[in-house]
Amino acid sequence: MMADHKSVTRMLKTARGQIDGILRMVEEDRYCVDISTQLMATQALIARINADVLKAHIEGCVASAVESGDEELKAAKLAEIERVVDKLAK
């Protein structure tokens, strides 16, 4: 993975902390809108992490495949990205 490992790890630990906090909120029967707000914040953070990882993949693995001149490898990497984009669009 070409993404900044420290940054990705830090953000994932932040997301884990947010989820732990949300679990406590549910256990404490906190106000639903407050829980929903925290859930949306966590979803946004996870989406950002995913975008960073995918960007690094495109800049690293996909770019290398394109530059390699290997048409089969290039097609495989582009198909891989298409599948991910399709999943994100759902």
Q: Where are the model-predicted features located?
A:
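Solvent-exposed interaction patches of small proteins and small membrane subunits
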Residues: 1-90
